[in-house]
């Protein structure tokens, strides 16, 4: 488990991370999302022990991270601007990382390189940006650490590659102790990968939620009722997060179980009723608006 408690980090007069508190459980894919400049990379670097918090503390499996070699054996960190030595091939990188991760899984590396259609003996300098990111994910998984920290690693990956990585992560989580932490400025890129998402804004954690729990407790229903009085009654009876109208069509986003919400709407004898799917972005819009923020100002 990763525990971030009241962590702050400033660069001159700019506070990149401000009293951030966050818990990341084992065997979940955790997404750390926020706009550019929200503090994601700084927080991830503090988790990786690259930077020391000015205030607060970070523990991985009960150990302080900064200047702790035992704690650092537990994770592999993929930077947003990872460096590859000149003329190195993918196979050369394996030799480099095996010095730090002796448990590196060579057989799995060969299998994944073939699965992702990457050439082991090809110079990395000839790889595209997406190919380099795929290579780093493969190396990170094969390093066989408990935690994998990814800073904007999924930025620009196409849907097919994201699905491949999602399947890879799911297989690793099923077979061993494995927890990926993914920082991204793009909610849509995290939607089909993460189990849990933390929203970072101005250096602080605005909210941290389990996605299935959020989807279970927030629903969007469109319906047509016989009159405005029924609409007003319904808005009082439900935990309404958002109401939209298009002519006679009423769209309600409300908190609660699907059955409880539908039961209250059905009691009004609607002329029409339909449950609509909610995207991760729509769920976050609802949550942040209730907290007094507009998501368009966060991203």
Predicted region positions:
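Amphipathic, soluble alpha/beta structural segments
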Residues: 16, 194, 199-204, 274-278, ...
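Generic alpha-helical secondary structure signal
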Residues: 15, 69, 107-111, 163, ...
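Charged/polar, solvent-exposed surface patches and flexible loops
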Residues: 99, 111-114, 167, 171, ...
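ABC transporter nucleotide-binding domain
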Residues: 165-256
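Flexible, glycine-rich phosphate/dinucleotide-binding loops
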Residues: 84, 206, 282
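ABC transporter nucleotide-binding domains
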Residues: 2-4, 9-195, 199-201
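Short, charged/small-residue-rich alpha-helical element at the C-terminal edge
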Residues: 219-295, 299
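Short loop/turn segments at beta->alpha junctions
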Residues: 89, 210, 276-279
